[in-house]
Each structure stands twice: as structure tokens, then as C-alpha cells.
């Protein structure tokens, strides 16, 4: 048809390279993306959000990149759903996939992010997630589901 594929799934490269964690995505950003600092911070923000809501469906196929006129950049986030799982699909650092915001903060340098910036990103995510219960009521989420996730969200806040 003459159209070209202008998107890239992390799973494409990781299947070939045998990758298994967020730091593999960091490597791709460092090697291939425009706006490296912006993309690294956005990835870090997404990892923090995934941890806070218990999104354990964070495998490589749920991370992608778009080819823009300036180069590769993270695609908009997608398929982010809360769960009661305490572990991520991907490793947060070199050795742990435990959904622990402290582990992420301690690993900020592996994401090429200064501690002050990492703390600020985490504060922003925590503030965004803190209002989840009011939003759930507004969206008419069944009370039993709100109750089910209450402890999960408290665990990470």
C-alpha cells in the first residue's frame, strides 16, 4: 500500500535481544530516541504509576515508540490497569520486579535521572493517584471494586 510502519513495539527488539526489564527500555531511549531526557523522565513516571496502581501487565508489548520527524519517542501510554499483584512483569532495576516505589527511587540513576528529579516525579504521581477514590465514585465504579483496591493503593501511597 505504500505506507510505512512508524511505530515500534519494545517487544520487537527485546524478543531478539532477550531483554527483560525497564532498563532495556532505558537503553533503547539512550541509543535511539530524540528528546532523551524527556523520554527517560516519562518512562520513569510510567514505572512509578504502574507501581502505584499495581499494574502488573507492564510487559514489553505494552510499551511502544513512535517515529516522529525528529526521531523516535515514547508512544502515549496504554493498557494501564490496576491489579492486586505485588510484582511487575518487568524488572524495575537489575534484579527486582517487586512493586515498590522505594526500589524505583533507589534505582533512579539507572534511569539516568537525578534523585531530586526522581523524587519530584514520584511526588507528582502520588498526588495524581491520591484522588483515585473520589474519581472512582464520580465514574460510578462499583463500591465492591473500590473496596477491593483500597488496600492496594494504600500500600503504595
Where are these regions (language model features)?
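Anionic ligand-binding catalytic core segments
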Residues: 1-157
